[in-house]
């Protein structure tokens, strides 16, 4: 099983909470296994959105999970950072207030926290 790097809740905005998780992957099957592993934790299984992007040897994949455009935000940040053979998952628990365009900034903030963690280590 692929080892997950789960940073937990890294920020909140107007009641919504965001967490970020990632793992090394080399195939779509690996991505699916990581998502399944993450969702074995009840909080993540019940999250409003688990958006993700992956850079694989065969190309890029992404999924918005109802948070339109969020997968592309994650993917572009991964591509700019040169992060390959990886999946990054940004989880949101909706807090009752719509965030509008700020939701993309929060996805960026969560993704940046993960990328920074990879650069600096635990």
Feature-to-residue mapping (PLM):
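C-terminal regulatory domains involved in ligand/effector binding and gene-expression control
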Residues: 1-68, 78, 116, 120
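Active-site-proximal loop/helix of nucleotide/amide-processing enzymes and allied scaffolds
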Residues: 69-71, 84, 92-122
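Short, contiguous clusters of charged residues that form electrostatic/catalytic patches at enzyme active sites
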Residues: 72, 76
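Short glycine/proline-enriched loop/turn "hinge" motifs that connect secondary-structure elements
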Residues: 77-84
């Amino acid at each position: 099983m692929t080892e997950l790097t789960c940073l937990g809740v890294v920020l909140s905005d107007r009641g919504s909470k965001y967490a970020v998780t990632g793992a090394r992957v080399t195939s779509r099957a690996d991505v699916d296994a990581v998502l399944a592993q993450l969702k074995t934790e009840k909080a993540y299984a019940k999250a409003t959105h688990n958006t993700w992007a992956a850079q694989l040897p065969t190309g890029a994949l992404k999924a918005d999970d109802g948070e339109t455009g969020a997968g592309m935000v994650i993917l572009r940040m991964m591509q700019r950072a040169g992060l390959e053979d990886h999946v990054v998952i940004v989880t949101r628990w909706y807090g009752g207030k719509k965030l509008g365009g700020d939701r993309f900034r929060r996805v960026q903030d969560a993704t940046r926290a993960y990328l920074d963690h990879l650069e600096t280590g635990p």
